[in-house]
From Swiss-Prot:
One of its GO terms (molecular function) is syntaxin-1 binding. It is found in: Synapse, Synaptosome; Cell membrane. CDD domains: SNARE_SNAP25C, SNARE_SNAP25N. PROSITE patterns: T_SNARE. Its main location: other. This is Synaptosomal-associated protein 25-A.
Length: 204
């Protein structure tokens, strides 16, 4: 009888320990899910900010291109004015290129496209039969499995977000380099045009 009582007590202790471990494991998966969801939200906000920054850079580069177009018109007008004033032989008539290489192709050489979503290893585990080895086989383990499945899916999406961010940052860095070249080119041409106009007015 004493041995039976001891065995029952041992089984009861084991059951309590199993319940405790199940509760702790469940809370752990809940925390994991919360953390990856927060990371996902942060990733989405970052992608949105990068997209908005990309739009701003597009507007800035379009402004540089418009200044370049306007400067071509201004340079033509100065040439016509120089001919009219008989200043064709004046050295200041010869406008420099102003960094013509800056006005090449605006393309970054990267095709903007969304990468195809693939099933990663964690998702494959969920598809093939779950993430955990069942002990209590109750609702807690069902929730653990569901939580881990969601965690695996979100981690896969975070990986794709990171790739998208890296590609967008590379694209924007190249665009910033182009904008800097165009800004330098425009400044040089504006300075030259101002000097030329000043000499013309001084000769007039």
């Amino acid at each position: 009888m004493a041995e039976d009582a001891d065995m029952r007590n041992e089984l009861s202790d084991m059951q309590q320990r199993a319940d405790q471990l199940a509760d702790e494991s469940l809370e752990s998966t809940r925390r994991m899910l919360q953390l990856v969801e927060e990371s996902k939200d942060a990733g989405i906000r970052t992608l949105v900010m990068l997209d908005e920054q990309g739009e701003q850079l597009e507007r800035i580069e379009e402004g540089m291109d418009q200044i370049n177009k306007d400067m071509k018109d201004a340079e033509k007008n100065l040439n016509d004015l120089g001919k009219f004033c008989g200043l064709c032989s004046c050295p200041c008539n010869k406008m420099k290129s102003g960094g013509s290489k800056a006005w090449g192709n605006n393309q970054d050489g990267v095709v903007a496209s969304q990468p195809a979503r693939v099933v990663d290893e964690r998702e494959q585990m969920a598809i093939s039969g779950g993430f955990i080895r069942r002990v209590t086989d109750d609702a807690r383990e069902n929730e653990m499995d569901e939580n881990l499945e969601q965690v695996g899916g979100i981690i896969g999406n975070l990986r794709h977000m990171a790739l998208d961010m890296g590609n967008e940052i590379d694209t924007q860095n190249r665009q910033i380099d182009r904008i800097m070249e165009k800004a330098d080119s425009n400044k040089t041409r504006i300075d030259e045009a101002n000097q030329r106009a000043t000499k013309m007015l001084g000769s007039g």
